[in-house]
A protein has these predicted regions:
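Bacterial N-terminal signal peptides that target proteins for export
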Residues: 1-8
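Hydrophobic core
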Residues: 12-20
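Sec-dependent signal peptide cleavage junction
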Residues: 20-28
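Short N-terminal segments immediately surrounding and downstream of signal-peptide cleavage
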Residues: 27-43
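Signal peptide-directed extracytoplasmic domains
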Residues: 70-125
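Soluble oligomerization/assembly scaffold segments of membrane-associated complexes
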Residues: 119, 129-137, 143-224, 230-231
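C-terminal low-complexity, Ser/Thr- and acidic/Pro-rich disordered "stalk" regions positioned immediately N-terminal
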Residues: 264-326
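Single conserved hydrophobic/aromatic residue that forms the stacking wall/gate
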Residues: 327-339
Length: 339
């Protein structure tokens, strides 16, 4: 069942995979909007309204089901990919501040899961809004966001790191099935911090880090769960990440999942003010510039910059489980859930 959940979840936002035909609308290519090909025109208009941009302000890419198949067939069976592509994203590379993520109508994956996994793919600084006109699970959003970033910057991310990021999302998703999204993200993210920060290569040392992080956060893991995390972190350690490149993102996720939003203290205040002034000088903070009224009421939301948004919008640890099951539901319903 857990494998079925993860496979289904990988598909939910897979339309973000950006090998589809690009339709540049202006010379400014640093911002990219992706729209699922199987959305109606009204739904596409709704997403543009939610992103609060006009078509002449961004580069727009239409993502097809074939794009999903090209990029996801290595991870999930074709019969589970389905035939519809509906999810959307808005991506803006930035110069500093780490990875900032906001989600809407994604009821399984959270902003923190996306942010910490995206850092593994080699992205350093970026603003991301991942959304859909109606609720889907959203784990597959990572793949498309990676590709959107490449399109926006004109630079290719390292293929090994992208694969590790996808694996990280799968491992975290499986763990979330068993211990909850917040605890799963905490163990993965905080263990990754220590491995990268201290350049830990020894497998036994990595094992001890995972065990200690789990114990410190009162997360009960069995040996199989621990070993899967250790194996992934061993591969991540071999990539020799520069901690300064991922620090802002990983420490923000740590802060969010710990529930202590004052933890970073005054040390980062001056830097944060500079970051905000620099990246939002044009008034184009895409995370806080969305128009929620476009999606109507009862939106499931999360934001790395506003951890309370998950609770306020009703995104709980149990949300999404029923949405992901492929058992005993009709084909049209299944396609709607995984697209």
């Amino acid at each position: 069942m857990k494998k079925a959940k993860t496979a289904a979840a990988l598909l939910c936002s897979a339309c973000l995979v950006l090998s589809g035909t690009a339709v540049p609308t202006m010379a400014d290519s640093v911002k990219v909007v992706t729209l699922g090909a199987d959305l109606t025109q009204d739904q596409k208009n709704t997403m543009m309204k939610y992103f609060n941009v006009d078509s002449n302000q961004v580069q727009i890419l239409t993502i097809t089901n074939q794009d999903e198949r090209d990029h996801l067939s290595a991870y999930v069976p074709l019969e589970q990919i389905g035939t519809r592509t509906v999810s959307c994203a808005y991506v803006k590379p930035t110069q500093s501040g780490g990875i900032k993520v906001r989600t809407a109508n994604l009821n399984w994956v959270t902003c923190n899961m996306i942010a910490t996994s995206l850092s593994t793919s080699g992205v350093k600084n970026c603003e991301v809004v991942a959304a859909c006109p109606f609720e889907v699970s959203g784990t597959g959003a990572l793949t498309g966001i990676q590709m959107a970033y490449e399109t926006a910057t004109g630079e290719q991310l390292d293929s090994t790191k992208k694969e590790l990021a996808t694996e990280e999302m799968v491992v975290t998703g499986n763990l979330a099935d068993e211990v909850g999204k917040n605890d799963a993200t905490t163990v993965m993210n905080n263990s990754k911090i220590q491995v990268i920060k201290d350049n830990v290569q020894n497998v036994d040392d990595i094992y001890n880090i995972v065990v200690n992080v789990a114990q410190q956060n009162n997360v009960n893991l069995d040996s199989d769960q621990i070993n899967k995390i250790v194996e992934l972190l061993k591969q991540i350690a071999q990539q020799e990440y520069n901690y300064d490149d991922v620090k802002a993102t990983l420490e923000q996720v740590e802060q969010n999942t710990s529930g202590d939003n004052d933890e970073l203290g005054d040390i980062d205040d001056e830097e944060d003010d500079t970051v905000n002034a620099g990246d939002s000088a044009d008034g184009d903070d895409i995370l806080n510039n969305v128009d929620n009224s476009a999606l109507g009421g009862d939106i499931v939301e999360s934001s790395t910059e506003n951890p309370s948004l998950e609770e306020e919008s009703g995104l709980t640890e149990d949300d999404g489980d029923d949405q992901l099951s492929l058992i005993h539901i009709s084909e049209p319903t299944r396609l709607a859930l995984i697209s």
